[in-house]
Amino acid sequence: MTDLIVIGGGLAGSEAAYQAAQRGLKVRLFEMRPSAQTGAHQTHDLAELVCSNSLGSNLPDRASGLLKNETRLLGSMLLECAEQASLPAGGALAVDRELFARLVTERIENHPTIEVVREEIKEIPDSPTIIASGPLTSPALSTSIAALSEEEHLFFFDAISPIVHADSINMEIAFRASRYGVHKGPSTTDFATSAQSSAQDEGDYINCPFTKEEYYTFVAALLQAQRIELRAFEDAIKSGVKAGHFFEGCLPVEIIAERGVDSLAFGPMRPVGLRDPRTGKRPYAVVQLRQDNLAGSLFNLVGFQTNLKFPEQKRVLRLIPGLENAEFLRYGQMHRNTFIASPKLLRPTLQHIHRDDLFFAGQITGVEGYMGNIATGLLAGINAAHLYHHEEPITLPQTTMLGALCHYVTHADLKDFQPMKANFGILPSLDFTSKIGKRERGAAYAERALADLESMILECRSLLLHNPTASLSDSREMT
C-alpha cells in the first residue's frame, strides 16, 4: 500500500519523497525518464542539475545562504548531498553535478520506504500526491493540471550555459582568481589532486579578460550570430524581452546584448574585483568559468546561457580571449519552463486550494533557484506527512526565507506573477535605528529568520527528523 505519490524525481520531488518517507510514509516516486525524455536532461539520475552547477551563496548574510541554513535546520537531505559533492566556488556552493545526482539517487533508491517508478504519470492521482514535475512537465500531465485548476499555465524561457574542457583553455591569457580575493580554497574531498589544490589557492574561477576592442568585437559577433530556430510552442520568445517571457536571472547573453552594447559589461561580464596579472589592471570585461566536476577537467561559462546554433556558439565563444581553441563538452540551449498560477491555486502550505491532499513543490510553483526548489520540496514532504498523521500542515513564518517564498507565490498579483528566487526584499521589513550597510542588514534579517524558525521547531518537534537541540546548534555554527 502506498501512502503518498510524488510526481517528479528532480530536486523538489526527491527532497519531498525523502522527508515524507523519513516521517513514516510509504512513498512511490514517479520519474518519467528514461522512458520519456525532456530534451534538457542528459542522464537518468534523480536530481539532475540541468542548468548551472551552483546552488548560490553560502554566506549567512545573503538570501541564498539564509535559505540554506533554514533547510539545513529542517534536515534537508539534498543539501547534505550537495555539501558532499561541493567544489571550490568562492563564497558559493557549487557541486560536481554528476556526483551530486548520483548521491541523491543512491539515497532515494536505497530508502526502505521509497519505491522509484520509472514511468510517466499522465493524470493527477486521486490519492495523496505531491506534484513536483518541474518546469519541463510533460504535455499530458500539464493538461491534467490545467483541467483541475481551470487555469492556463504561465511560462518563461530558461537557457543553459556551455561547458568546456579545462585543458583547452589558454592559461597564458586566462587567469585564476576570485572576485576581491574571496575563494573557498581546495576541496576537502579525496577526489581533488594536489595540483588542483595548488591552482585553487590562486582563486576558484578561471577568468578570460577582454580589452575594450576585444569586447566590442565579441558583442558584434554575438548579435549577428544565428540562433536556434524556435519550435511552435516557443514562438513567443521572439518578443521575449518586451513580453517578459524570460526570467531575469536566466537571460541568454544575446538577449542581454540587445539591450545595449555595454549591457554584458555591466552584467555577467562585469570585471569588478578582478585584475589581469598580465597588465596589473582591471579588464574592460571578463568571462568567468567555474569548475563543473571534482576532477577539475570541466568548466562552465558562468551566466553565459545562450540559444545560438551550435556551430555559431563554437565560432563566437572562441572569440573570448583564452578560449580561442576551446573544446566544448556541452553547448548552451534553451527550453520553455512552465509554472502554475500559484496565487490563485495554492495555499502557503503548498496545498491546492480545492484538495487538501494535493501539494505542489519546486519550480512549477513559481519558486526559482535550486535551493528554492529543494526547500519547497522539503516543506511539501513535511506537510504531506503531517496530513497523513492527522496533524495541521505547517505554515512557516513570513520572516523566514522559505516562509516568505511560499507567501509570495501564493499571494502575488496574478497579473504580474513571475518566478521569484530567495531575496531579502520579500521579507517583512526591519526598522533600523541608524543607517547600516547591506551586509549588516542581511545579517539582521538572517538572525531574525533563524530565531523565528528555531522557536517554531521547539513548538513543533515533528518538523525535525533528528535531535532538535543538536540541529539548532549545528545551524548556529554555520552562521
Question: Can you annotate each of these PLM segments?
Answer:
Residues R107-R315:
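Predominantly flavin-linked oxidoreductase catalytic cores and closely associated redox partners
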Residues M1-A12:
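Beta1/beta-strand and adjacent pyrophosphate-binding region of the FAD-binding site
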Residues Y18-E80, Q398-V409:
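N-terminal FAD cofactor-binding segment of flavoenzymes
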Residues Q42, N58-T105, E109-T113:
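A conserved beta-strand/loop capping segment in the N-terminal third of enzymes
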Residues I374-I394:
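Internal hydrophobic alpha-helix adjacent to the cofactor/substrate pocket in enzyme cavities
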Residues L301-V367, I374-T376, I394-H411, F417-L427:
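A glycine-rich dinucleotide-binding beta-alpha-beta segment and adjacent secondary-structure elements
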Residues H466-N467, D474:
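Intrinsic-disorder-associated, low-complexity terminal segments enriched in Asp/Asn/His/Tyr and depleted
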Residues M420-L465:
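C-terminal auxiliary extensions adjacent to catalytic cores
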